[in-house]
């Protein structure tokens, strides 16, 4: 069994118990890793504190970081470094788009809505990687959550699909840029999961049903399955893997 004792990871993007990032946290926790969590708003901190009761973490390392603020990202990671020292990796599961930009026609996306989705869902990985690098002097791993809508046009995914496409390109360029520092950057393309974010996608139940009917495994995946792949990518088991996008979607990406 993989042992991640003496490893420290920052997890970004837990909103509630259904969050993909919480599935990642549960797996890393079971493997013995020390976990550091970031959140955006105070209500998210309260939710995190409740969820921590389900984990085996001896201390609660919680930091408020709004990724739309350079200052908060810079200061947040600086404080993490002061409190816990160097880290071994980051799991980035942050994305946002306005509801109207997900439900309407893509061609009607506003400039403001387009840029907002890009800023939170893609650029945030760039600045997070820049600051996290300072805490990984001997190398490490950064993993981001994406979705098939970044590779293909998926009905009702709209502006978020474009943001995920940007995120996936971001992963590749960060992998190239940070490779000499022995920092690997990868993505996990997770199948549709009932998360808080998924509520904004129109026809989500239809998407879930299509996976059950057409995917090779004939079922949908869950947060913990994504967490298992994240553990692989964040650990030394994947030491030769970077710039990759691994699909955890019951094989749906492989069929027509």
Curated annotation (Swiss-Prot):
Residue(s) at site: Critical for cofactor specificity: 40-41
Catalysed conversion reaction: a 2,3-saturated acyl-[ACP] + NADP(+) = a (2E)-enoyl-[ACP] + NADPH + H(+)
Residues annotated as binding substrate: 97
Active site: residue positions: 147 (proton acceptor), 157 (proton acceptor)
Pfam family, one: adh_short_C2
Pathway the protein acts in: Lipid metabolism; fatty acid biosynthesis
An MF annotation (GO) of this entry: enoyl-[acyl-carrier-protein] reductase (NADH) activity
Amino acids binding NADP(+): 13, 19-20, 40-44, 66-67, 94, 164, 193-197
Enzyme Commission number(s) of this protein: 1.3.1.39
Gene Ontology terms: biological process: fatty acid elongation
UniProt cross-references to InterPro entries, sorted A to Z: Enoyl-ACP_Rdtase_NADH, NAD(P)-bd_dom_sf, SDR_fam
Alphabetically ordered keywords of this record: Fatty acid biosynthesis, Fatty acid metabolism, Lipid biosynthesis, Lipid metabolism, NAD, NADP, Nucleotide-binding, Oxidoreductase
Function summary: Catalyzes the reduction of a carbon-carbon double bond in an enoyl moiety that is covalently linked to an acyl carrier protein (ACP). Involved in the elongation cycle of fatty acid which are used in the lipid metabolism.
Entry's family note: Belongs to the short-chain dehydrogenases/reductases (SDR) family. FabI subfamily.
Subunit structure of this chain's protein: Homotetramer.
Record protein name field: Enoyl-[acyl-carrier-protein] reductase [NADPH] FabI
